[in-house]
Amino acid sequence: MTTPNFSIDLTGRTAIVTGASAGLGRRFAKVLAACGAKVACTARRKDKLDDLVAEISADGGTAQAFALDVRDAAQLQAIIPAVTESLGQPDILVNNAGIVDAEHATRMSIELIDDVLDTNLRSVFILSNEFARPLIARKTPGRIVNVASIAATSYSGGGAALYSTTKAGVVRITETLAVEWSKFHINVNGIAPGLFATDMADGMIERAGDFSVHFPRKRLGQPEQMDSTLLYLVSPSSDAVTGTVIKIDDGQGSR
């Protein structure tokens, strides 16, 4: 009998998750830890990270909290050495941190424009490079999972034009770095979620109403519905998969 090439055992691996204090990032950190990875949980809200680390530890996992403002290039440059010293060289990176602008373009302040660009796009490119550089030097393979959005390819005009633009940029970063780093066995892939039940979604619903009534299945996605895709993209099973962005939207968006 042929044994399927599939494993979710991440023992011996070290992962970094940005934006881990809430929402999808929090779920991603817990799932990676549950499968054996040592997880560096990063975000600006250190108090919420401490709670997350306590939960992971109580479940038998290994995690550590690192305060990180992804808008600050110096902090992005410092985080890889800090994680390496505490948990070992990271070989999994989940670029999850992101904010939504929820504004029509002409109403956005320069400060908000900078925040959205720096958080959603610039940080992904900088941190991916900081992550890849030591792996390339050591000739060690790695996995990057970038969190994009179905907004990368679809925008209704109701607000969040810049968010949509940055997520399209995340898709292109995923594709271009995958090509550039394929020879180093660093796989770069992405997940493009629809609207999932998170703090960010709660805020959008509070401002604009319940979007789910317009969806074919009349529901929001649940973060746990992404577990298998995340694990696939960081496991040996996806060894030949790079430069791919997987849409997970429960049929919410157009095709």
What label would you give each PLM region?
Residues 2-7, 231, 242-255:
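Short C-terminal tail/terminal secondary-structure segment
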Residues 14, 21-22:
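Conserved glycine-rich cofactor-binding loop
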Residues 89, 182-187, 241-243:
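Short, small/polar-rich loop/turn modules that mediate ligand/substrate recognition or access, typified
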Residues 104-105, 109-117, 211:
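Substrate-binding pocket helix/loop in short-chain dehydrogenase/reductase
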Residues 128, 166, 174:
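Active-site helix of classical SDR
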Residues 133, 179-183, 239:
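Alpha-helical segment proximal to the catalytic Tyr-Lys
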Residues 149:
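Residue(s) in the substrate-gating loop at a strand-loop-helix junction
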